[in-house]
Amino acid sequence: MNISIISVGKLKEKYLKQGIAEYTKRLGAYAKIELIEVPDEKAPEQLSDTEMEHVKQKEGERILAKLHPDTYVIALAIEGSMKSSEELADTMDRLATYGKSKVAFVIGGSLGLSDAVLKRADEKLSFSKMTFPHRLMRLILLEQVYRAFRINRGEPYHK
């Protein structure tokens, strides 16, 4: 399986880079992992609703440009469905079983994802009703994908 993590913005924090590198390495035994960063749209601190939509649209265009037509897209969105680790493992197993060899998880910028990206998504996934920093979500997501593969293989790690 080829898994892409498409996220907005460049990762700067060393501790996050180290954690992401560790889980990317671990996942290499199960899947080909590609981490794709698209530039965030530069904007002032205070934005009108129109300006916020413009920023999301620009970032969304960059995300959509990275998606292949045959890729199964899972958008991380607060309005998405919540799953347990076991349910995410079932989703990953189902995708593999039905021949979905390309899966992309999409993480938006600080303002979220554009409507166009959400429409392109085959599934919307929420990790919580709480808001997490989008850069931290990369690490959390990779850990959960790793956990899903371990669960599906019946390997120790889970719990």
Swiss-Prot record:
Question: Does the entry feature the keyword Ribonucleoprotein, yes or no?
Answer: no
Record-linked InterPro entries: Alpha/beta_knot_MTases, RlmH-like, tRNA_m1G_MTases_N
* Catalysed reactions, as listed in the record: pseudouridine(1915) in 23S rRNA + S-adenosyl-L-methionine = N(3)-methylpseudouridine(1915) in 23S rRNA + S-adenosyl-L-homocysteine + H(+)
| SUPFAM superfamilies hit by this protein | alpha/beta knot
Disulfide pattern:
none
Q: Which UniProt keywords apply?
A: Cytoplasm, Methyltransferase, rRNA processing, S-adenosyl-L-methionine, Transferase
Q: Where in the cell is it found?
A: Cytoplasm
Which CDD domains has this protein been placed in? RlmH-like
Enzyme Commission identifier(s): 2.1.1.177
A single GO cellular-component term on record? cytoplasm
Q: Which residues of the sequence carry a binding annotation for S-adenosyl-L-methionine? A: 76, 108, 127-132
* Major place of residence: cytoplasm
Pfam assignment, any one: SPOUT_MTase
> GO MF terms on file?
rRNA (pseudouridine-N3-)-methyltransferase activity
Family membership noted in the UniProt record? Belongs to the RNA methyltransferase RlmH family.
Its assembly, as annotated, is: Homodimer.
Q: What does this protein do?
A: Specifically methylates the pseudouridine at position 1915 (m3Psi1915) in 23S rRNA.
According to UniProt, the name of this protein is Ribosomal RNA large subunit methyltransferase H
